[in-house]
């Protein structure tokens, strides 16, 4: 019985260890799902991790690991995500090395670096991924995605950030021993410090500082009483946004 060759994602710097594509995808999926759970998108995060590097199943990428020419390995996953209607995921996958692409337009060609262009691009065959990676059920469309374009864009950027971190950390864990990182202060501790710092602004002097104080108060009230979600802040330069 023919046994398929193991497809590799990484080789250690000393050449003594390898990480298969399947192991990397699954490891990244776990981390990305955990990160995205913070904004109720764990399923989407899992999909991102499982699809982001399926282009590494191509023979051309395997040759790249042995010193061959560079090959685009991110477009494949973006195209699969788009076929399932997961456009925010497609953007995140397409840009997880080079940054989020512009959307572009339907007239864009496969030579364009836009999202429309990437979706038309021919990629190296990577069929073995379906034998090793099983996608869970299609993630539901989050309620927040029905609100407005700003929310959709912010949500896409959050997913992108989760994927970039998860991909980097899983690769780092393979390449070297996991690095101990301090957890830092809790959000409650940071909020306490912020409140202590801004307490001196409770009696602002002058019209500008009064306006700044009013803006801060509006933001604080929204955070305490508003429903969970994504908010935008439109304030002119000098208004104290930071």
List the predicted regions and their residue ranges.
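Hydrophobic alpha-helical scaffolding
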Residues: 149, 205, 235-238
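Accessory nucleic-acid engagement/destabilization modules that flank
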Residues: 1-200
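Flexible, low-complexity segments enriched in proline/glycine/serine and punctuated by aromatic residues
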Residues: 189-217
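N-terminal pre-P-loop "Q-motif" helix
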Residues: 21-27, 206-229
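Basic side chains
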Residues: 56, 211-212, 241
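Walker A/P-loop
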Residues: 226-242
């Amino acid at each position: 019985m023919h046994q398929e060759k193991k497809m590799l994602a990484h080789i250690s710097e000393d050449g003594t260890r390898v990480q298969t594509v399947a192991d990397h995808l699954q490891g990244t999926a776990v981390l990305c799902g955990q990160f995205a759970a913070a904004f109720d998108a764990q399923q989407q995060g899992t999909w991102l991790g499982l699809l982001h590097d399926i282009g590494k199943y191509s023979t051309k990428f395997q040759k790249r690991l042995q010193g061959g020419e560079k090959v685009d390995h991110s477009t494949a996953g973006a195209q699969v995500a788009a076929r399932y209607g997961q456009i925010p995921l497609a953007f995140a996958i397409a840009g997880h090395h080079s940054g989020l692409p512009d959307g572009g337009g339907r007239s864009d060609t496969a030579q364009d670096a836009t999202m429309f262009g990437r979706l038309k691009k021919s990629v190296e065959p990577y069929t073995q991924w379906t034998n090793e990676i099983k996608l869970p059920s299609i993630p539901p469309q989050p309620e927040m995605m029905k609100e407005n374009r700003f929310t959709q864009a912010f949500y896409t950027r959050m997913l992108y950030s989760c994927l970039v971190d998860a991909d980097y950390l899983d690769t780092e864990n393979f390449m070297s021993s996991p690095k101990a990182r301090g957890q830092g202060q809790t959000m409650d501790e940071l909020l306490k410090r912020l409140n202590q710092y801004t307490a001196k602004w409770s009696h602002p002097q002058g019209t500008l500082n009064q306006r700044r104080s009013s803006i801060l108060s509006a933001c604080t009230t929204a955070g305490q009483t508003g429903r969970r979600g994504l908010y935008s802040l439109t304030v002119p330069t000098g208004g104290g946004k930071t």
